[in-house]
């Protein structure tokens, strides 16, 4: 099957590699250089999203935010400048659910199919092919693309119609942010009280407080390893989507708003490109105490 992939960053590169390893011919485009491993697997690098679309049956998009997806789709050399008849656009970025519905409608009007399929699992999940994939769109289109999703992830769910995948991802990001904040508070509390955070985390991992966030991000906080698997700047973007959507729904998300303020503090102190586990640094600043 002829596939296209647009956006080869921290997540997109390993995802595209997994598709290429399965024997699929890929045409790709990205802002920076294409990884040598991907080229060695036969991927063809082209200049524009239009060229990717012309050469492909199914086109995957993995870019940072809503404006970038809109440019990829509808820009001067975007996907929609090629014929979309018989083609499927699969947007795996994390973007606005409201705009996603508009994008899907416009692609459908031009004869193409559209799935929104944001992911969770970070760089590790992308590399290992264990992502959780939350899909919005037509069931028949989902079933057609599902074998490709299975090369990228393990927990693959058709949530509902177009936009529902993105809504699910926003909910996911709320939960992840609040859990990172909770782990940060707990370990910082233990550390300032004089306990060893390494041993506290070890004890908590055996009880009801155990979680993937405590396992992975708790370790990063203790070891001070904040190289980005998922950048604070991107989580700020996701929580902005949550808060904007909540406002439209006349819904209060008080703890989400608090987490966003903590991410904003990190960003204001030069941490926007750090891993989101570095949220702990905002709490450390207020406590005048480093966890480790």
Swiss-Prot record:
One GO biological process term: DNA damage response
Cysteine pairs forming cystine bridges in this chain are: none
The pathway entry for this protein reads as: Organic acid metabolism; glycolate degradation; 3-phospho-D-glycerate from glycolate: step 3/4
| An MF annotation (GO) of this entry | NADP binding
Q: What class of enzyme is it?
A: oxidoreductase
Alphabetically ordered keywords of this record? NAD, Oxidoreductase
Q: Name one Pfam family in it.
A: NAD_binding_2
Q: Which reaction does it catalyse?
A: (R)-glycerate + NADP(+) = 2-hydroxy-3-oxopropanoate + NADPH + H(+); (R)-glycerate + NAD(+) = 2-hydroxy-3-oxopropanoate + NADH + H(+)
Induction, per UniProt: By glyoxylate.
Identify which residues the record assigns to the active site. 169
Q: Which family does it belong to?
A: Belongs to the HIBADH-related family.
What is the protein name given in its UniProt record?
2-hydroxy-3-oxopropionate reductase
- Which organism's genome codes for this protein? Escherichia coli (strain K12)
């Amino acid at each position: 099957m002829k596939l296209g992939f647009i956006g080869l960053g921290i997540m997109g590169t390993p995802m595209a590699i997994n598709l290429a390893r399965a024997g699929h011919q890929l045409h790709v485009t990205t802002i920076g250089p294409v990884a040598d491993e991907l080229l060695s697997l036969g991927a063809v690098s082209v200049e524009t999203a239009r060229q990717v679309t012309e050469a492909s049956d199914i086109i995957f998009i993995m870019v940072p935010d809503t404006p970038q997806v809109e440019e990829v789709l509808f820009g001067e050399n975007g996907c929609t400048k090629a014929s979309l008849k018989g083609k499927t656009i699969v947007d795996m970025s994390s973007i606005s659910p409201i705009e996603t519905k508009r994008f899907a409608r416009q692609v459908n009007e031009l004869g193409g199919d559209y799935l929104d399929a944001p992911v969770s699992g970070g760089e590790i999940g992308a590399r290992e092919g264990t992502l959780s994939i939350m899909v919005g769109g037509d069931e028949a289109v989902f079933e057609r693309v599902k074998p490709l999703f299975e090369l990228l992830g393990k927990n693959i769910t058709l949530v509902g119609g177009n936009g529902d995948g993105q809504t699910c991802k926003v909910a996911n990001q709320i939960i992840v942010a609040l859990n990172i904040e909770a782990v940060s508070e707990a370990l910082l509390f233990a550390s300032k009280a004089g306990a060893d955070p390494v041993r506290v985390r070890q004890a908590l991992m055996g009880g009801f407080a155990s979680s993937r966030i405590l396992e992975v991000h708790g370790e990063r906080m203790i070891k001070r390893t904040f190289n980005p698997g998922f950048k604070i700047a991107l989580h700020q973007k996701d929580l902005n989507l949550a808060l904007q959507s909540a406002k439209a729904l006349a819904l209060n998300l008080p703890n989400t708003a608090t987490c966003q303020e903590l991410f904003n503090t990190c960003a204001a102190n030069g941490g926007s490109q750090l891993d989101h586990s570095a949220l702990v640094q905002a709490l450390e600043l207020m406590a005048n105490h480093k966890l480790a």
